C-alpha cells in the first residue's frame, strides 16, 4: 500500500474507503475520503486492508508559465510563513503542497494574474502556534528586502492561530508607506469549504491599494460574499473554526473587499501613502522577550507574579477582570514587581470595552502601586507592545508610552456599535 492508492480499511465495526495520504505517525494510516475530509486510523485497529485501485504518486512539478510582467499592474510580493492559505492540491492523491513560486501561486489562484505581478517567497514553514518573536523579526527583515527590491505591496501568508500577534508585532516594528497584508485560511485548500483562494485574492487586491499600514485580511462572514480588512493592532481571532473568525475589536473593519468584483469599500478614513517614499522603510526590531501575559482569576496567588520577577522578567501584562481589577490578595505580588523595577500594565478580559481604573477603589489602588492602564488595547497587542517598548526605550519612557497610541492600538473613544 502506497501513498495515492485508493483503499478500503476494515475495522471491528466499520469500514473506511479513501486515498492514502502522507502520515506523520508511523502507527497511523491517513486516508482522504470522498467527502474531502481526512481521517487517521490506528494501524492496530485495522482488521483488513484492500487496495481497490493503485494510484499515482504525488506530482508537484509544473511546467514553467514564462509569465511576463504587466507594466500596468503593481508588483506584489507574497511571503509565506507557513499555513495553508496558498497551497496547491494534487487532486489525484489529495496531497497538499505549498505553492510559493510565482508559477505555483498563479496555478493555484489564476485570478491573481488580473490583479498584480506576483512574486512568491518562503521565509518560514512553521505552524503558527510555533511562532517566536525572532520569527517576527525575520518577517520584518524579509519585508524590508522586498520593498527595497521594488515591491509595491506585501502579502504575508500565515497560520491563523497567532496571526494577530504577528500583525501587532509588525505594526510596531515596521514603518513603511507600503501596505502589508497578513492573510490566512480557516479551511485548508483540500476542503470544499476552503476560504483560502478568496482570501488571498482579496489580500492581493488590498496590497495594490494606495494605503499604508499593517492589516489582516479574512472572510467577513461565513459565506463567500465579502472579505474584511482589519487594522493590525485592533484585530483578534474570536472563533476557533468559523471562516469569519477574525474581527475588529472596538473599531469597525477598515475596509471590505468583494473577492469576485474586486471592489474595495472603505469603512473608515483611509491612511494614504506617500508615493515619493514608497521604497523607504525603517525597522525597529529590538524586542524584550522577558515579558509575560497573565490572566487574573479568583484566588490567583501572588507567588505567580513573584516567580516571573525572580526569573528576570522585565514586564508583565495583567489581563484583569472588568474595568481592570485583581483580587486584593494579589497586591503583594504587584508590590514585589514594583520594588524590582518590573513594569506592570493592565488590560481587560472582556475584550470589548476599555480599562478604567478610576471608577472603583481596587483600580485606584492598583494605579497607586504603579500599574499602568492600557486603555482599550487588546491583551495580545499590549503584550507585544510592551516587548517592543522595553526593547527600544528605558523603563521610565516605556511606562509613559504604554498608555499612548503608537500604531493605532488605542482609540480616543469607542463607537458603541463596533
Curated annotation (Swiss-Prot):
Keyword Oxidoreductase part of the UniProt annotation: no
Alphabetical UniProt keywords: ATP-binding, Ligase, Nucleotide-binding, Protein biosynthesis
Record-listed E.C. numbers: 6.3.5.-
Molecular functions (GO terms): asparaginase activity; ATP binding; glutaminyl-tRNA synthase (glutamine-hydrolyzing) activity
Reaction(s) this enzyme catalyzes, per UniProt: L-glutamyl-tRNA(Gln) + L-glutamine + ATP + H2O = L-glutaminyl-tRNA(Gln) + L-glutamate + ADP + phosphate + H(+)
GO biological process per UniProt: amino acid metabolic process; regulation of translational fidelity; translation
Domain Asparaginase/glutaminase per the UniProt entry, residue ranges: 74-405
Top class in the EC scheme: ligase
Active-site residues, as the UniProt record annotates them: 84, 160-161, 237
Quaternary state and interactors: Heterodimer of GatD and GatE.
Role: Allows the formation of correctly charged Gln-tRNA(Gln) through the transamidation of misacylated Glu-tRNA(Gln) in organisms which lack glutaminyl-tRNA synthetase. The reaction takes place in the presence of glutamine and ATP through an activated gamma-phospho-Glu-tRNA(Gln). The GatDE system is specific for glutamate and does not act on aspartate.
Similarity remark: Belongs to the asparaginase 1 family. GatD subfamily.
Name this polypeptide is given: Glutamyl-tRNA(Gln) amidotransferase subunit D
The organism of origin for this protein: Methanococcus maripaludis (strain C7 / ATCC BAA-1331)
Amino acid at each position: 500500500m502506497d501513498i495515492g492508492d485508493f483503499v478500503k480499511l476494515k475495522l471491528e465495526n466499520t469500514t473506511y474507503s479513501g486515498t492514502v495520504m502522507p502520515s506523520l505517525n508511523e502507527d497511523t494510516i491517513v486516508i482522504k475520503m470522498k467527502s474531502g475530509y481526512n481521517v487517521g486510523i490506528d494501524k492496530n485497529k485495522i482488521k483488513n486492508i484492500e487496495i481497490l485501485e493503485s494510484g499515482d504518486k504525488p506530482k508537484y512539478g509544473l511546467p514553467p508559465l514564462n509569465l511576463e510582467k504587466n507594466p500596468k499592474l503593481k508588483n506584489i510580493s507574497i511571503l509565506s510563513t507557513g499555513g495553508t492559505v496558498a497551497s496547491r492540491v494534487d487532486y489525484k492523491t489529495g496531497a497538499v503542497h505549498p505553492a510559493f513560486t510565482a508559477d505555483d501561486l498563479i496555478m493555484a489562484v489564476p485570478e491573481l494574474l488580473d490583479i498584480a505581478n506576483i512574486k512568491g517567497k518562503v521565509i518560514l514553514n512553521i505552524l503558527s502556534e510555533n511562532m517566536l518573536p525572532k520569527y517576527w523579526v525575520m518577517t520584518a527583515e524579509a519585508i524590508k528586502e522586498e520593498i527595497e527590491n521594488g515591491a509595491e505591496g506585501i502579502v504575508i501568508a500565515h497560520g491563523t492561530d497567532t496571526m494577530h500577534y504577528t500583525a501587532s508585532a509588525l505594526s510596531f516594528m515596521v514603518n513603511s508607506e507600503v501596505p502589508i497584508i497578513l492573510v490566512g485560511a480557516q479551511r485548508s485548500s483540500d476542503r470544499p469549504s476552503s476560504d483560502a483562494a478568496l482570501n488571498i485574492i482579496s489580500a492581493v487586491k488590498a496590497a495594490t491599494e494606495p494605503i499604508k499600514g499593517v492589516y489582516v485580511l479574512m472572510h467577513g462572514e461565513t459565506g463567500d460574499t465579502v472579505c474584511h480588512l482589519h487594522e493590525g493592532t485592533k484585530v483578534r481571532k474570536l472563533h476557533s473554526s468559523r471562516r469569519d473568525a477574525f474581527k475588529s475589536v472596538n473599531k469597525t473593519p477598515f475596509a471590505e473587499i468583494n473577492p469576485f468584483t474586486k471592489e474595495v469599500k472603505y469603512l473608515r478614513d483611509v491612511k494614504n501613502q506617500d508615493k515619493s517614499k514608497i521604497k523607504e522603510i525603517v525597522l525597529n526590531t529590538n524586542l524584550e522577550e522577558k515579558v509575560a501575559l497573565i490572566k487574573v482569576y479568583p484566588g490567583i496567588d501572588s507567588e505567580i507574579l513573584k516567580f516571573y520577577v525572580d526569573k528576570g522578567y522585565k514586564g508583565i501584562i495583567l489581563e484583569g477582570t472588568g474595568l481592570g481589577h485583581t483580587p486584593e490578595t494579589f497586591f503583594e505580588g504587584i508590590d514585589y514587581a514594583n520594588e524590582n523595577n518590573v513594569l506592570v500594565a493592565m488590560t481587560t478580559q472582556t475584550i470589548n470595552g476599555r480599562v478604567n481604573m478610576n471608577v472603583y477603589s481596587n483600580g485606584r489602588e492598583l494605579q497607586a502601586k504603579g500599574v499602568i492602564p492600557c486603555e482599550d488595547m487588546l491583551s495580545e497587542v499590549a503584550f507585544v507592545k510592551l516587548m517592543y517598548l522595553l526593547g527600544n526605550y528605558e523603563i521610565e519612557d516605556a511606562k509613559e508610552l504604554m498608555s499612548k497610541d503608537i500604531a493605532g492600538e488605542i482609540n480616543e473613544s469607542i463607537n458603541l456599535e463596533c
